[in-house]
Amino acid sequence: MPATDESTGETLPPGAILNKRYVILKVLGEGSFGVVYQARDKRLVRSRKQVAIKQMPMQSIVDCERQSDLRATLNHPAIPRIFDYFALEDYSYLVEELVLGQDLEAILKAQSDFLSEETVVGWAIQICDALDYLHNHPYHPMIFRDLKPSNVMVDDDGVVHLIDFGLARAYPPGFFQEAQPEFEHLWKGLAMGTEGYSPPEQYQGYVRPQSDIYALGATMHHLLTKRDPRNELPFSFKRCPVRSLNPDVSKGLEAIVMKAVDLDVEGRFANAREMQTALEGLHL
């Protein structure tokens, strides 16, 4: 099919051109959120730079703008950079750094045996580092709010990337360090997340950095045991400790995971850096 400018069909064919700049190469994925394409930037002829483009319904334009604003100041290896966003007819588009690899859910489904402890810990350490960066950002501390296997990509070099900031939320600097009455209204928000991975307080519309720690613990539990929390009773991790499902996991790692998924916020790790230190101390 010949390339056409300003193409806005539901699924764009290879060769279609968006915004007089981006040449669609192929579809990377589709879901309720929309479509993700691999594309080439026409303006950068010599480098033949490729990008990922998320196509979403027009009602998502506010989310596109919000994500772009939130991520514009982020600079971390695990966070894909934002390059552009725009709207055309019935759709909004978010252009970001292309990450080629597999998400953790796809990796897990492809495994006939349990993933190794060393592999899961390696991923978790990288995720902790990214969460620590987000939670302590100097301009707008951020809670990811939707950490789960399908939102974590591992590239061909083994580097972890957080790939969907659709539910991420930013807060004023210092917001989590001390109670500030003038920010009290910011604690309350919509109860959003993914059942099985989100902690109890998130269903009540309240989140803290420890909410992401719970989601990481839930993700690790799933990766180590193959027990999908979406198919189980909510908040039931204590009924199924890691080693009861996978005896090859060390007691030390089991303790870290179970601490992360404590129902009480205060029972979890105080912050992502503390959890990262515990993981690094396993000496695998």
For each predicted feature, which ranges?
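AlphaC helix of the eukaryotic protein kinase fold
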Residues: 57-73
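Conserved short submotifs of the Hanks-type protein kinase catalytic core
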Residues: 89-103, 107
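Conserved activation segment of eukaryotic-like protein kinases, specifically the C-terminal portion
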Residues: 179-201
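Activation-segment/catalytic-loop signature of the eukaryotic protein kinase fold
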Residues: 85
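Protein kinase catalytic-loop region centered on the HRD/HxD motif
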Residues: 129-142
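C-terminal lobe helix-coil module of Hanks-type protein kinase domains
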Residues: 196-284
